[in-house]
Regions:
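Amphipathic alpha-helices of TPR/Sel1-like and other helical repeat/solenoid scaffolds
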Residues: 1-10, 37-53, 76-83
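Alpha-helical protein-protein interaction modules
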Residues: 43, 47, 59, 63, ...
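Generic preference for flexible, low-structure residues
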Residues: 20, 30, 35-37, 65, ...
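Hydrophobic face of amphipathic alpha-helices that form TPR/SEL1-like repeat modules
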Residues: 21-24, 63-67, 100-101
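Residue-level detector of flexible, active-site-proximal loop/helix-junction positions
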Residues: 56
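Short, charge-rich amphipathic alpha-helical segments embedded
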Residues: 3-30, 166-169
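Short coil/turn connectors between adjacent alpha-helices in alpha-solenoid helical repeat scaffolds
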Residues: 24-39, 70-74, 105-108
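Short alpha-helical scaffold segments that flank and stabilize functional sites
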Residues: 7, 17, 22, 52, ...
């Protein structure tokens, strides 16, 4: 991306993708200690991308994701709505907005968008199966409180990502199905011996900290 920017300093998407890449690296622990001030760098890239082309769909989609990472939910929704107005049926922005609504106390609306994204493009960009999209719906249905539907989507998934697994386990606990919860916890720990579900949930950018804490309690 540095080379892309050097080759074309007026390419707004290059700045947006660079900001997104740094954010993903921070979120996954890849960039610890490698950049002096990564958060300031992200903000600089966001500002530059927006200045260069405020009506680029891809830029607005990425700016939605980046602001969600920084928990600036108002800005995330602003850019997400702009992206939707430019390309209302792109499953990537439907997925981004669906996730945003789920973590900002609008889970019913969020689940509808996540299901629509799954139906439009089950695999998603760069994926080889539908597991990511289905897992996102499982998370949304758990937050919505539709625990039975979360379990129904679990029947469709191949390999669960950790947040989907946490959503399944929390749904089982919420339904009082303690034995099944214990079995799923055991499977998760065997598959991910160095991973803690509480740490996975901690990385979710819930607007309501109470919802995050309740989620953690249900997976213990």
């Amino acid at each position: 991306l540095d080379k892309s920017i050097a080759a074309d300093p007026h390419n707004a998407q290059a700045y947006a993708w660079r900001a997104c890449s740094i954010g993903q690296g921070l979120g996954n622990g890849y960039l610890e200690g490698e950049m002096e001030n990564p958060f300031e760098e992200i903000k600089t890239m966001i500002q530059k991308a927006s200045e260069l082309d405020e009506n680029d769909f891809e830029c607005n989609r990425l700016l939605c994701e980046i602001n969600k990472f920084f928990e600036d939910f108002e800005q995330a929704e602003y850019y997400g709505n702009k992206a939707c107005s430019l390309n209302p049926n792109d499953p990537r922005i439907l997925s981004a907005m669906g996730d945003l609504f789920v973590i900002t106390n609008r889970a019913e609306e969020g689940v509808n968008l996540l299901v629509k994204a799954y139906e439009l493009d089950p695999m998603g960009l760069g994926a080889s199966n539908a597991d990511k999209r289905i897992g996102d719906v499982m998370f949304g249905t758990y937050v919505k409180g539709d625990y039975d539907l979360c379990l129904e989507y679990d029947k469709k998934i191949g390999k669960k990502h950790p947040l989907a697994w946490a959503s399944l386990i929390a749904s089982l606990e919420s339904l009082g199905r303690s034995q099944e919860k214990s079995e799923e916890l055991k499977k998760f720990k065997e598959a991910n011996p160095e991973m803690l579900l509480e740490e996975i949930i901690e990385k979710v950018h819930f607007e309501d900290l109470g919802a995050k804490n309740k989620f953690k309690e249900l997976v213990i």
